[in-house]
Amino acid sequence: MSNSQLKIKTKALPNSRIAIEFEVPAQQCKTSFEDALTTLCKSANLPGFRKGKVPKSVILQQIGSKRIQASALEKLLEKIWKQALKEESIEPLCEPELAGGFEPLLENFNPEQTLSVTLETDVAPIPKLKTTKGLTTEAEPITFDESKVDELIEESRKQLATVIPVENRPANHSDIAILTFKGTFADDGSEIEGGSGESMEIDLEEGRMIPGFIEGIVGMKINETKTIDCQFPKDYQDEKAKGRKAKFDIQLQDLKTRELPKLDDDFAKQASDKNSLKELRNELTNRLKSDAKNRNKKNRQESLLEALVKELEVDLPKTLIDEEVRNLIEQTARNFAEQGMDIKSTFTQDLVSSLMESSRPEAEINLKKNLALNALAEAENIKVDSQALEEKIKEVNIELANQKNIDQKKLRQVVQNDLLQEKLFDWLEANNTILEKKPKKALNEKVKSSKPKNTQKKTDKTKKDSP
């Protein structure tokens, strides 16, 4: 009970939600009704009366008591809500919801009687960790693979290659084939959507198309026609095509190949800002080593965080989940826009609804990760040293010297969050165990070696097919 008049009682609900139960005395209800009536009298424009001089009895007759009661009830709810926030120290995450709805409440509202009403709202969750130490988890190690340096150099050579016609030989792997083709499903002969093309350029590289397609073209001669048997993978993105066998009627119209530049210092100068092939190799080696180190660190951190989340006890409020879902959808939209896609036509109502549903698990995981780290900082009293913070802010400002209108308040918050996260992961690594998980594969993320000064010299614009 907060005072002798208005009675306020709070009750915890599931999903970090609270109910605020009010018992509003009859006198307060009556006062609210009288205030609403007085306000209408002052603002009403009725024929035969001066503005502000309309008698209350006339207002009641012309407008009706229910409309006045509705206005009184709205003002009353607003007032008691603000009072509850102040007296009960409530920090809501969203606007209050009236239990039972407004219309039923209005129907039973009598300004001469005590009013019982309940408002509900989401509040910040209180995360708790069952334990923070002695956890055991696994992380896949990422190591530097020197063969990737050669792969990146070969990729640059391909980008700088001259495309020349092929004569008097069949198609080989790594050639560029100009094809006209039509695909049908083997089981019913129906045409494959997106499975046809005319005069389309295709790189004859393994894994570029569905299994059997490239292999069927290798060995063909210019102007030769052929039917190729293929099968769509079971995990193919198109549900209609998954695992189905297909036939492609193909005509090889033309054939080209790449003439690669010599692997020497001139190539290094053309492919990058380095003066020699040795310098280029050293730069690529350092980049790949740095990338492997960073990915290894990220793997370890993600593994520790996943283990910590398993120890988390928290109820997630719908408000925070919905907010994070919106953030994920907005990020998806930005990614699409960066790829040149038309957001307005792409993001239909059906797609947005689908994304809202499919993004929910990821949104919940993101929230739990953040809350787990917050709970760790609280439980173990992990803080950012003020001197370290100031030094880092100074360092970042030097790096951003050429940028204008930097929001220093936001910058401070970002830097502080980054430093705190680093300290939290250092603490987790020092107090828990990470076992080495057998790697699925070596590092195969491609790091761009350089910014080529010249693009690949092609006689026609390359087109990509969908199979």
Swiss-Prot record:
Compositionally biased intervals (Basic and acidic residues): 457-467
Name of one Pfam family that matches: Trigger_N
InterPro entries reported in the protein's UniProt record: PPIase_dom_sf, PPIase_FKBP_dom, Trig_fac, Trigger_fac_C, Trigger_fac_C_sf, Trigger_fac_ribosome-bd_bac, Trigger_fac_ribosome-bd_sf, Trigger_fact/SurA_dom_sf
Region Disordered, annotated ranges: 439-467
PANTHER family, per the entry: TRIGGER FACTOR CHAPERONE AND PEPTIDYL-PROLYL CIS/TRANS ISOMERASE, TRIGGER FACTOR-LIKE PROTEIN TIG, CHLOROPLASTIC
Domain-level remarks: Consists of 3 domains; the N-terminus binds the ribosome, the middle domain has PPIase activity, while the C-terminus has intrinsic chaperone activity on its own.
Single GO BP term: chaperone-mediated protein folding
NCBIfam families in the record: tig
Gene transcribed to yield this protein: tig
Swiss-Prot/TrEMBL keywords: Cell cycle, Cell division, Chaperone, Cytoplasm, Isomerase, Rotamase
Domain PPIase FKBP-type: residue ranges: 174-261
Signal peptide: none
Family as reported in the entry's similarity comment: Belongs to the FKBP-type PPIase family. Tig subfamily.
GO terms of molecular function: peptidyl-prolyl cis-trans isomerase activity; protein folding chaperone; ribosome binding
Function: Involved in protein export. Acts as a chaperone by maintaining the newly synthesized protein in an open conformation. Functions as a peptidyl-prolyl cis-trans isomerase.
A cellular-component GO term for this protein: cytoplasm
EC annotation from Swiss-Prot or TrEMBL: 5.2.1.8
Keyword Amino-acid biosynthesis assigned: no
Protein name: Trigger factor
